[in-house]
Amino acid sequence: YAKNRVQFGKPIASFQAIQHHCANMLLYVEGSRHITYKTACLMDEGRSSKIRIATAKGWVSEAYKRVIALGHQVGGGAAIMTEHDLTLYSRRAKAAEVAFGDAAYHRMVVASSLGIHE
């Protein structure tokens, strides 16, 4: 979208703020992918722990929300239209939060596992 949307005579992807948002989205996605694969690999080997799993779930949950928010900022008004997939991703993120717990819940699980949460 950022490459195709033109504002002030040039694609919005040429603006530094948009570039930073897109770069941050990539960092969140790649970080989530890494921690998910690492945790899955450790689980497959039987070397995972409750803390590692909760950490991965918490990171991915928070990253998903941030990527959605940045996507809405990059997309502007178009991002809230049902014709764009971002609205579907927003609904899925909320449903996943309800079904699997949000980042705050998973931070609480980590703290409890460390013995620092009541």
Residue ranges and their predicted role:
Residues Y1-E118:
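Alpha-helical interface subdomain recognition
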